[in-house]
Amino acid sequence: MADSEICGKRPVVGRRVTLSGERNRRIFKPNVHKMRVMLPDGTVKRMYVCTKCLKAGKVMKAPRIPKEG
């Protein structure tokens, strides 16, 4: 599972608790997407970004350049 390259968010281990109180191990996975990001120097790079960083404006999605043909 990928980590967010902006904030370092990664999967964490926890427990699922049933109504009867039984506990089972589980993994909480962050909502991470691989997308094209424009860096401050203007270059475009593919990186893993969590949606919280995307909504907060910590990264800017790279503009799409239509193919000519």
UniProtKB/Swiss-Prot annotation:
What organism is recorded for this protein?
Answer: Aquifex aeolicus (strain VF5)
Q: What is the superkingdom listed in this entry's lineage?
A: Bacteria
| Ribosomal protein listed as a keyword | yes
- Tell me which family the UniProt entry assigns to this protein: Belongs to the bacterial ribosomal protein bL28 family.
An annotated GO cellular component of this protein is: ribonucleoprotein complex
Molecular function GO terms recorded: structural constituent of ribosome
Please give the name of this protein.
Large ribosomal subunit protein bL28
Write down the NCBIfam families for this protein, in alphabetical order: L28
| InterPro entries the UniProt entry points to | Bacterial_rp_bL28, Ribosomal_bL28, Ribosomal_bL28/bL31-like_sf, Ribosomal_bL28_bact-type, Ribosomal_bL28_sf
Q: Taxonomic lineage of this organism?
A: Bacteria, Pseudomonadati, Aquificota, Aquificia, Aquificales
Q: Which GO terms describe its biological process?
A: translation
User: Which keywords annotate this record?
Assistant: Ribonucleoprotein, Ribosomal protein
A Pfam family that the UniProt record links to this protein: Ribosomal_L28
